Each structure stands twice: as structure tokens, then as C-alpha cells.
Amino acid sequence: MKKLLTLLVMMCVVSFMKPAQACTNFLITPGASADGSSIVSYAADSHVLYGELYHYPAADYPEGAMREIVDWDSGRYVGRIPEVAHTYNVVGNMNEWQLVIAETTYGGLPNMGNPEGLIDYGSLIYITLQRSKTAREAIKTMAELVANYGYMSDGESFSIADPNEVWIMELIGKGQEKGAVWVPVCYLVENPECCCLRIFH
């Protein structure tokens, strides 16, 4: 009887389980790595992303050029924003300046989304990689894009690194709240699929 009860409890537990869809990043600062490198790993828990390696070549644009924004997850056209005069070469999640941006999604309440926003988390990553040289510049670029054009995704934690520094930046809901924290020199950090920053300034 005890075995049967245990089996029934286990079956109930398993029947309520959801499959995991959890991106995970590991961030290692130059002071914590053996050779002084910044390292960011990115495990996107999605069967459709295995082997993806996106390429955006460096380019020059005339004054007044516009960039089309397409929602990263759905492929839906969202709108246009002004393009900058020069963009950097991007392969995967790293640009020619060794700036890396990865993400983990922790979601949020459905009513916190901004249907008027033009920038989703994927567009934010790749536009920023094309426009920024350093982690600090990336944080500034991301904040400006969200402030100017609105943020349409849920809660996201971005792992941002250049050869000298490692940062975690988080955006929540409508893009009204955002925060960034510098990872100290000799640290290894796991950035799971959850909000890590608790106080936003």
C-alpha cells in the first residue's frame, strides 16, 4: 500500500510539471579567470536556436536612414527608428570590439507589457551590439533605446561584457524600471532566469 501511495504521489507530481525553458548565463570577470579574460556563456533553452549564429556586417548609412524593427520572437514588423551613421560587425552575440550581450527572460505580469513599444529584447541586443564598443556604452545605448522607443518585452536580465568589465542590466515590464550592476573584478556569477537586482535607482 505504501508503494502504491508513493507511486500515485510521484505520478501527480510529474503530471503537474512543466518543461523547463530557462536560459542561463555564466559571467566571469577578468580578475576571476585564469588568463584575465571576460567570459559570458549563453545557454538559450530553445530547440529552435541550436546552431544559430547571426551576422550583421558593419555598414555606413546616409543621414536620415531608417532601420526596420522586427519582433525577435514572432518575426512581426513593429516599426522604424533612425539608423546611426556607422554600425559595427556582429557575429552571434559579440561584436568586433569583443562586446558581448546575452539574456535570460524572467517574464512578468501580462498587463505589464507595452503594446506601444517598438523595442523587444532581441532587437535591443542586436541594435546595441551594432552601436556600442564597451559594456558601459551598451548600457547607455540600451537605456536610450528603451526611453526613446518603448520596451515591449517582459522582464529580462542582460549579461553584458567587454574585455575589461562585466555587467548585469535588467529591464522590467514597460521599460519604466531598469537597473544595471557592475560585477566586481574577481567574481564568477550565474545569471539564471530570474530577476537578480532588487533595488532600482
PLM regions: where:
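Positively charged n-region of N-terminal signal peptides that target proteins for export
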Residues: 1-4, 18
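Sec-dependent N-terminal signal peptides
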Residues: 4-13
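Single-residue recognition of alpha-helix boundary sites
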Residues: 13-14, 109
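Sec/Tat signal peptide C-region and signal peptidase I cleavage site
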Residues: 16-22
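A contiguous strand-loop segment
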Residues: 23-121, 141-201
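Second-shell loop/turn segments in exported
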Residues: 113-115, 123-132
